[in-house]
């Protein structure tokens, strides 16, 4: 059984856990004691059984361990007890008693364990029954310690009483005046309501009834007045309203409600009365503030109205609208009559005391109200004439202005301003010149400069207005300084009020000084004799009153413990405790002397605590007077600080105005320049983006021109190659017979090449005309292109000249070599070349027709492009003439405005020129295709078949002619170029013709 007697105690300041753990310890100890008793009985029958002895020893050791653990936990719990409260004191006494019992048990167990150890050593269970007084003496010491603790509790109680009294009085002093003012407002509201209802004569009856009700209960006069005013406003008579209010206040207190909880109850009940219906929300609010009252009210309503039982509950009846406010009023009357409303607790007594003091202050407050109101009215008059009190400040500003003029500060400022105006003028001039090129904008620049001058004039006018404002501030300060008499009157009244508070707090509640306070009220109204009234109050010795008060407290305690049931029960419990303690003390009287000494010391300490509490109480009174004076000084300090702060704020507003004005000017100018910068940047980007399609457009034009030229020369080469092939073919057939024909061929070829030259000249004239039209509009763009085209045509001319020279030399050689043969066949060849000439003539007509159509096409295209570009730039000129108006008018929309315009122009040019470009590219592709086909019709070269001609006699350098074994002919030529020709390039060209198989 001993093995099962272990446990754990877990205490974290939770009373329930602690008590449960102690129950577990007590249960374990009870089981162990029963086991020990059985072991002792067994050892009496078998004294030599050492096994039983060992079991008993282990059992006692376990009990000792549990006792020590319990004592430790009790000490820990004692250290957390607050002996300043009633519950804490009860708990402390209980824990101290338990700790003494546990310590006594532990001492006894230690003695028994030693006896068992001796029996085990001797081997025989033979223990004499004797009492160890050591543990008992320790118990007596513990008892003395507990009485010492009781003394500490008593001292703490008296100290707490003194501290609570001082705290209550101090806090009450702070709230009395505030409560009196609130009560005054509530009375004014009641009086106005009664006058409105035509019952003004009932004001004294209602107000005195509410004051009496507040004194007799824990209610606040303000709350009772407000509730009765609500009832009267809803149509109740004065008597009915008073009855309802009394019933509600008394019922709240009867069911345990405090004065603070009454506020919530009054609010909820007043809302239901005003709305004329009982809502669940208001009933819940009433119940939350006073649960007992809410429950009793619900049950009373159900009992007084049996018809409501059909709804089952108050909540259901309320939801159905079956409960009326009249039912609530009757139930509340019943509850209020049962409660009686008498003061029942110390807290209620304090509430009643505070309310009495607040009501006593009402006459004083009524007397002071007219004085303070007149002072406030005078201050209102100061406000109306404040504009006349600023002369001194205006004078100061004028003197300051004169000093600034004398020391040159204003002239420096003027120079700075002139410099700024000059800077603005220069900048605006630059902007005007920039925009002037767009037409019409320079006029707006002049208007902007005029705006800057207008701003400077406005600033000057504002400075004049500022002088008037400062003059008004000076008038106000002067008027304030002239009102010293009114301020002194206010000061005298406040001092009188302070003296009245001091006299009231010392005299009220201890002695009766009604006549003295009436004199005090009269003295305050007259403003004289304040200290005389105070001396009359203090004529009675306050220490005599103090003794009477202490005697009253003692008498009250005697009455409490002898006449009241609660006091009798407390005293009987205390007597029982003394009896139980005395039984232990009588048995062991050795410590009684020290006990009486401790009691006496406790009494002395208690008296000291009481005296210290009284000292603290009077110190609180002095501190209250100091606080009032501090409030007065704080009032005037705050007043002066407010005046100074107002002047500083006014001056800061003036300086802030000029600062904001200058910042506004800077922001406007910055915005203008930023907008213009964005405009120029956007315009530049627009030009780059807009004319990009034009570049592509003219690139396509020049590509077309190149294709046309390429087609022309392909045709020329084709004609030459075809003619040459025909000549070679004819020569192959009749070379032996028709040598004389070559003279005719020479003239025909000359005619052909003359036509070719005319064609090239016409083509060039057309190109020059096109180029001149383009160069007239974009001369700068075409200069670079013209150089390129010029070099290209120079190369083409050089090539044509060289080619013509070669052809001429070839034909010269041929005609010289075969002149006789050509003469013989001239008629035949003449017919052949006549047909060839007809073919060439027809071909040339077709070509000129094509180029005529091309020229007409380009003429129309350029006219359209010219009209489009002209229209665009005309629109741009119109836009530029109105640009400044747009800039000064709408800064926010200018970006999107230009974006839309430039985007539209760009899209227009993209669509128009893009289509033209595509058309030209298509034409170029068609011409290139024709050129490739024409070039493919007559593949060959001017040097084809030269291997069959012996050119050794021509002087052009055929130096070697040999035939290899495989019948291939190898010719070696010495090539000499014409004037301006590069021989190496010519040789490479001839070599390339051989490699390509065209020669």
From Swiss-Prot:
GO cellular component: virion component
Matching InterPro entries: Tape_meas_N
UniProt keyword annotation of Repressor present: no
Gene3D superfamilies xref list: Apolipoprotein
A Pfam family hit: TMP_3
Localization (cell): Virion
Keyword terms: Viral release from host cell, Viral tail assembly, Virion
Single GO biological process annotation from the record: viral tail assembly
Physiological role: Probable tape measure protein. Serves as a base for tail tube protein polymerization and acts as a template for tail length determination.
Family note: Belongs to the skunalikevirus tape measure protein family.
Protein name: Probable tape measure protein
